[in-house]
Each structure stands twice: as structure tokens, then as C-alpha cells.
């Protein structure tokens, strides 16, 4: 994050009053979430216990039960403990009878409702979270874009390098 903070300072000093557009590839480092991010697979089935506290959220407008759409949802209990999967899903109006907390090893690829963690992890507020990088750039008043995943040889910087490689011989004097 130090590098991007420095890049923002340099840009703002060089171009006062302008807005930068920072473009990144799909590196896992660029997608790092903050410590209080919403992560269903790190939650217990029940409230409390050894699980980290997660940030409060707003129940998405895509929530299956329209009665709860747009409502704020605290991710801690009245006593300050982290809420479990069961409580969070019940507050959203999900019927979770018969579902286990998590699949034993890995959730089946085709399944969307195999366990509580999978069900919650597919909710819009859990899926669409801003990375630390994105938040930092937006808070500074700039734009942040992520390129779609592609093969490394199709990376735009590779295209520029190839273009320069092709053009260089025609512009270099051999005398």
C-alpha cells in the first residue's frame, strides 16, 4: 500500500485538481480485503467462539426475502460477540433447516445451497467487497479499475513492449 500512497502523492503533485485512473491486473495481492471483511467460511455456525468480528453490512436488495432488503445488519450480538452463520441467515429470512455449517472438505462446484457458509458467501454483500487497494484509491478521490483475467502474454504491457520491439529497428541508425 505504501507504493500506491506514494503514486497518489506524486500524481497529485504533478497534476493538481485532476483525477487519476489506476489500472491493475487480477493479482491476488490487489484483491486483499480489510481485516473486518465479510467472510462466511471463517464464521462459526453459532454466535461467539473463536471467530473474528466482521464489519456490519446492509442486507442486499437481491436478498430472496424482500422484507429484509436494504435493512442494516449488525454482525455482532448485543453482548459484542461475533454472530454465527445461523443467526445471520435467519435475520435475512432464509430457511436453513437441515443445512450443516460447512461441507466437510470442499463444497460441490455445482451446489449453491449445500451448507450455510456457501449460502451466505454467495450473497451480494459478501461477494462484492472493495479491496484495501480500491478503498485507498477511491478515498483519495481517484478511480480504480481491474482488468479481466487473461493469459500473462496478453497483458497490455506485453503488447507495448512488443510494439516497441518491432518499431525499434526501423528507427535506429546503424551508422
Residue ranges and their predicted role:
Residues 1-175:
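Short functional hotspots at interaction and active-site rims
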Amino acid at each position: 500500500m505504501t507504493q500506491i500512497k506514494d503514486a497518489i502523492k506524486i500524481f497529485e503533485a504533478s497534476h493538481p485538481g485532476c483525477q487519476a485512473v489506476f489500472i491493475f491486473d487480477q493479482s491476488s495481492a490487489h484483491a486483499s480485503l480489510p481485516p473486518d471483511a465479510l467472510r462466511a467460511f471463517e464464521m462459526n455456525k453459532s454466535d461467539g467462539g473463536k471467530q473474528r468480528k466482521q464489519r456490519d453490512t446492509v442486507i442486499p436488495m437481491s436478498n430472496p426475502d424482500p422484507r429484509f432488503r436494504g435493512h442494516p445488519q449488525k454482525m455482532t450480538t448485543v453482548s459484542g460477540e461475533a454472530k454465527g452463520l445461523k443467526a445471520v441467515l435467519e435475520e435475512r429470512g432464509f430457511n436453513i433447516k437441515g443445512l450443516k455449517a460447512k461441507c466437510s472438505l470442499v463444497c460441490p462446484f455445482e451446489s449453491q445451497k449445500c451448507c450455510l457458509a456457501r449460502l451466505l458467501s454467495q450473497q451480494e454483500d459478501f461477494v462484492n467487497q472493495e479491496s484495501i487497494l480500491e478503498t485507498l484509491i477511491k478515498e483519495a478521490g481517484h478511480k480504480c479499475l481491474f482488468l479481466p483475467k487473461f493469459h500473462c502474454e496478453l497483458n497490455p504491457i506485453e503488447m507495448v513492449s512488443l510494439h516497441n520491439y518491432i518499431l525499434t529497428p526501423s528507427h535506429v541508425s546503424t551508422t
